[in-house]
Amino acid sequence: TEIYTGEDIFPYTTLFRSIIVAVLTTIVTLGLLGGYSSKTVSAILGTAIGVVIAAVAAMAFGKAAGITGYNVSDIEALNYVGQNTKIKIGELLFAGIIISALGAVMDVGMSIASTIQEIYETDKTLSMKRLFVSGINVGRDMMGTMTNTLIFAYVGGAITTLVINYAYDLSYRQLANSYVIGIEIMQGLSGSLGVVLTVPITALIASFLAVRKK
């Protein structure tokens, strides 16, 4: 008789745990900042969904491009860790993407929720549709700036590796097809997608909860 463990049923345990940590961090952080009001609930839900979207996007991109956690530069040290612990080092790359995107997603979620709440407090006759449109209009500018923040942060973290590869006089084709570039693109796209989709999701939830309080 075969005995199945939780890891056999759901193999992405490290990734799942990182999502749980991100959600719990969001609940505690936003709760301490804004209290547990409808505004905070909107921000928490929007952030949680945005983080899950970033995780799914990273996994999908990694599978399509053949990128795993074993393609990072510190794989020798990580292999030693993996042999002596139960940590699944192949998922650490994607767990890191979730954690690194959390700050930007949380910032956008709270900003959109606060904006809609303030607009509604100013004019409580506004409909849910009007509040949603206002949230989208405000979030449109935030998408670009927060996406740039994520991309520059990822590039800055990998600048030494990029310079080393450039110093070896690799062709642009070799450089563009390297795992380093692929990982940076994956991080930027997945994190940016999480930020972009957090805006309409949070705006929808916040406008619904604001009107529902009447």
Where does each model-flagged region fall?
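Short helix-loop junctions at transmembrane helix boundaries
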Residues: 35, 56-92, 158-182
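Pore-lining and gate-forming transmembrane alpha-helices of multi-pass membrane transport proteins
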Residues: 43-51, 82-83, 87-99, 145, ...
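Hydrophobic alpha-helical membrane-insertion segments
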Residues: 45-62, 141-157
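Hydrophobic transmembrane alpha-helices
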Residues: 48-52, 61, 92-109, 155
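Hydrophobic alpha-helical transmembrane segments of membrane transport and translocation systems
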Residues: 153-155, 159-214
